[in-house]
Amino acid sequence: IEGITNTGGLFGRDQDRLNQGYALEHTGYFDGTKLPSYIESQGLRTDLKEDKKGPAFLFNGLEEQLKPEGSDCTNVQINFGAQSSAFTYDAGRKVYLKQINGQAQTDGKTGNQLAFTNVFVLEPDISVRDSVGHKEIDWDGGPDSTGYYVSNGGVQKIIWSKDPNNENSYLRFYDQSGQEIAINRGKTYIALNYKNQATFQ
């Protein structure tokens, strides 16, 4: 199931957001109401493969909330072009509260401000692949990749990668020496963006 050819008509564009000037990548939506019938009509598998039954990331212990090895970080600013996001650390709750364009971003059902234990900023190579403006993102990462792991009041510069030629493989995060890092348990936000568009304070 993918949105490039939109097989099954599961994906669309929010015309209101387009009219408001949002960048194309911020206007897509997925119509989940059509998913069950599409899965059934295509005879798609609904059980997890064995290699997907474990955790997606290497985690710290249940009671551990560790600060990344690096600098202090209580504020993250990410410039996405037409939109910007910010994350401000709430030390009492040990989460980063999300803002969008200077306003608190809230859950549509609960009204609560979005909060994340972990924030990743990954800087893959990004290019425009067609006249519509679709982006080509290099998901592979590797030893020359750049990223940042923010959690518990700190930020650490990292390397990230996926298994070569396997877009379905999990992301892996490493310190600058190449050792895989464990992350804190909790909600995680992953930003993919052009290089040098984020600041950490």
Predicted segments with their positions:
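A surface/extracellular/periplasmic glyco- and lipid-processing/surface-interacting theme
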Residues: 1-201
